[in-house]
Each structure stands twice: as structure tokens, then as C-alpha cells.
């Protein structure tokens, strides 16, 4: 399935494009 936020190896979170378009993710608007 699709997850809004996924952890990168460096510990930061990355946001899927679907989430960025359709929802809020990782504090982005």
C-alpha cells in the first residue's frame, strides 16, 4: 500500500507524491 511518510536511511522522512497532492504529509502543505 501507499504510505504518506517513509523514513529515509539518514533518518529524515520522505513524502510520497500522492500524499503531497491529496493530503498533508510531514508538515508540508
From Swiss-Prot:
Q: Which GO terms describe its cellular component?
A: extracellular region
Transmembrane domains' residue ranges = none
Which keywords describe this protein according to UniProt?
Amidation, Disulfide bond, Ion channel impairing toxin, Neurotoxin, Secreted, Toxin
- Disulfide linkage: 4-19, 5-25, 15-26
Listed GO molecular functions?
ion channel regulator activity; toxin activity
**In-chain residues carrying the UniProt-annotated modification Cysteine amide:** 26
Tissues in which the UniProt entry reports expression: Expressed by the venom duct.
Indicate the family of this protein: Belongs to the conotoxin M superfamily.
Q: What is stated about domains?
A: The cysteine framework is III (CC-C-C-CC).
Entry protein name: Conotoxin Bu17
The lineage, from the top, is: Eukaryota, Metazoa, Spiralia, Lophotrochozoa, Mollusca
Amino acid at each position: 500500500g501507499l504510505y504518506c511518510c517513509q523514513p529515509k536511511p539518514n533518518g529524515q522522512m520522505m513524502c510520497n507524491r500522492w500524499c503531497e497532492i491529496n493530503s498533508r504529509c510531514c508538515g508540508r502543505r
